[in-house]
């Protein structure tokens, strides 16, 4: 009888204490859920490119982004050239995300038969909440190789003369759900320059922005200002304006630009197109992504 009373007492004690323990667990769970979370800015731009320039976005880890970029001839070619549609230049590129912060890319352009490769690293990422960071900051380094046949093959030519390098610090902010602005101080180094009056190292200041119009439509613009006395007087600053159209796994970018080249060395230091003279090209970029490696849970 005494043992029975002992068991009953233990049972009553357990039933009385259990709700308190579970209530404490639930309270602790609620407190943990209420801890401030870090919210990172997403979709500052639809793709890793604004138009010609790199954007604040990187390709996701394990994702391969195939880009086809196309530029037609100048609109001032008139009806005989079908306002530029008879002529075209193209770049095909592959970008791959290695980590959340690092991506690499390669490409080949018909302009000067250029091969290019680059590395793009996200140093800081805009965030709010538990950890606040007002800006996204990215470092970009690229190399371009001109593979045209030598103009004067009989003289001594050096492989290094084919190379040019670009370094950029890209920083910007997504101010609202629809508006993003970024700046791109840039240095382009050319091993070979056309004349002794030009500089091997060219400094340019770029600015780009995006305004979202609808859920799947946005307008983009970018401009590069090359500081004076670095390149030939007949060269022009690059200005491009266009639209992003998102359709499932594809992003179409339709734009007008005074630049033919689609790598930094070309559209920053070798651009001859003039908006005032109608030397404007219609073009498009198409982006298609493929998941090569599934993200870890």
What spans do the regions from the language model cover?
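Bacterial N-terminal signal peptides
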Residues: 9-18
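Sec/Tat signal peptide C-region and signal peptidase I cleavage site
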Residues: 19-23
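Transmembrane beta-barrel domains of Gram-negative outer membranes and organellar outer membranes
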Residues: 24-156, 163-167, 172-183, 187-191, ...
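Positively charged, low-complexity, intrinsically disordered RNA-binding extensions
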Residues: 234
């Amino acid at each position: 009888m005494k043992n029975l009373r002992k068991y009953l007492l233990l049972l009553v004690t357990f039933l009385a204490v259990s709700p308190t323990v579970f209530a404490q667990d639930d309270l602790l769970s609620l407190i943990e859920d209420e801890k401030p979370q870090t919210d990172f800015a997403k979709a500052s731009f639809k793709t890793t490119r604004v138009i010609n320039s790199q954007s604040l976005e990187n390709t996701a880890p394990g994702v391969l982004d195939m880009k086809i970029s196309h530029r037609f001839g100048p609109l001032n070619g008139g009806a005989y050239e079908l306002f530029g549609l008879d002529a075209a230049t193209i770049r095909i590129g592959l970008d791959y995300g290695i980590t959340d912060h690092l991506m690499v890319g390669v490409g080949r352009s018909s302009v000067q038969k250029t091969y290019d490769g680059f590395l793009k690293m996200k140093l800081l990422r805009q965030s709010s909440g538990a950890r606040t960071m007002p800006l996204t900051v990215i470092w970009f380094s690229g190399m371009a190789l001109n593979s045209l046949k030598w103009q004067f093959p009989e003289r001594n030519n050096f492989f290094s003369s084919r190379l040019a390098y670009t370094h950029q610090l890209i920083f910007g902010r997504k101010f609202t759900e629809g508006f993003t602005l970024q700046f791109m101080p840039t240095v382009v180094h050319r091993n070979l320059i056309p004349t002794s009056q030009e500089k091997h190292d060219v400094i340019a200041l770029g600015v780009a922005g995006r305004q979202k119009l609808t859920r799947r439509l946005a307008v983009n613009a970018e401009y590069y200002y090359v500081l004076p006395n670095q390149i030939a007087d007949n060269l022009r600053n690059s200005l491009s304006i266009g639209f992003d159209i998102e359709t499932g796994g594809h992003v179409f970018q339709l734009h007008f630009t005074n630049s033919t080249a689609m790598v930094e060395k070309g559209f920053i230091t070798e651009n001859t197109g003039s908006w005032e003279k109608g030397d404007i090209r219609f073009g498009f970029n198409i982006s298609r992504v493929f998941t090569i490696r599934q993200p870890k849970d």
